């Protein structure tokens, strides 16, 4: 028996690199996370905690803000203006690479030119005139390929959304290009920041950039050389700071909610770290509240 498999895709990425967290003023001893472990083990565990903190943020945000490509299926209805409005699961929407539609989910028709779509922060609008089909405000016409208002349509589409948050593969001072580990979401003409401590710098992608490529031409030469693994992107600093705060809170939490019996005084109860550091998490969530997706 054939098995149906969803085309919907889900990925999970960290909002910070290990070095970005280490460079932040957190007062955390991140070299003693694994008892007896070497530096590689300490860094691996720190990376795991950062990923868990990022996942916690995604749960609150109802989406991931790291630029990635998604394929989704959705049933929609043609509106009164003869348009199809898509509300993807992730935002902000950067690009649309494919769109298929039809009244039969097993026989969808592809949109020939995705550049004709109208982009909004959390929506994509597809006018039926761009699909080469007929539309009547009075309902479906009496021949194939016609649609009317409120008619249900099956759609499948692939898009990119989120903020670029990748790492450098190679970057040499004086060079007019660099390579990254993942080019998803990078756009020609857009500015991005390299997060490299005292050597941090801002770059702008040249108009010759090919969408999705890991080789990124620049409008001006790099001022510094940057090692592999250095973060680059346009992720808002508030989001990165929120991840730093949540990671710090996760690292501080220990099982210390105990009662201490003294000989000459009343027993005292220690305040658990999960309560003590809830303020850090609350501040972090407040910083990213504007990016929550309303479903």
Where is each model-derived feature located?
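Divalent metal-cofactor coordination and adjacent catalytic microenvironments
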Residues: 1-295
């Amino acid at each position: 028996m054939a098995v149906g498999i969803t085309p919907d895709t889900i990925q999970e990425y960290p909002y910070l690199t290990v070095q970005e967290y280490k460079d932040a003023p957190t007062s955390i001893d991140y070299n003693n996370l694994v008892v007896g472990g070497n530096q590689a083990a300490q860094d691996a565990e720190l990376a795991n905690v950062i990923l868990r903190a990022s996942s916690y943020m995604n749960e609150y945000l109802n989406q991931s803000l790291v630029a990635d490509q998604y394929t989704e299926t959705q049933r929609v209805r043609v509106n009164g203006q003869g348009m199809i409005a898509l509300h993807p699961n992730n935002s902000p929407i950067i690009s649309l690479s494919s769109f298929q539609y039809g009244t039969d989910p097993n026989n969808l028709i592809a949109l020939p030119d995705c550049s004709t779509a109208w982009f909004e922060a959390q929506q994509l609008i597809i006018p039926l005139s761009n699909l080469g089909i007929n539309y009547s405000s009075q309902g479906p016409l009496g021949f194939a390929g016609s649609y009317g208002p409120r008619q249900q349509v099956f759609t499948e589409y692939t898009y990119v959304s989120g903020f670029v948050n990748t790492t450098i593969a190679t970057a040499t001072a004086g060079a007019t290009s660099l390579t990254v580990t993942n080019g998803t979401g990078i756009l020609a003409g857009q500015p991005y920041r390299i997060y490299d401590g005292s050597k941090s710098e801002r770059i702008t992608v040249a108009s010759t950039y090919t969408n999705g490529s890991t080789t990124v031409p620049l409008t001006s030469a790099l001022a510094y050389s940057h090692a592999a693994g250095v973060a680059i992107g346009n992720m808002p600093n508030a989001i990165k700071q929120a991840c730093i705060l949540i990671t710090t809170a996760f690292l501080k939490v220990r099982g210390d909610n105990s009662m201490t019996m003294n000989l000459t005084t009343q027993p005292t109860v220690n305040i658990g770290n999960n309560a003590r550091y809830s303020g850090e998490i609350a501040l972090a969530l407040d910083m990213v509240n504007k990016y929550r997706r309303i479903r």
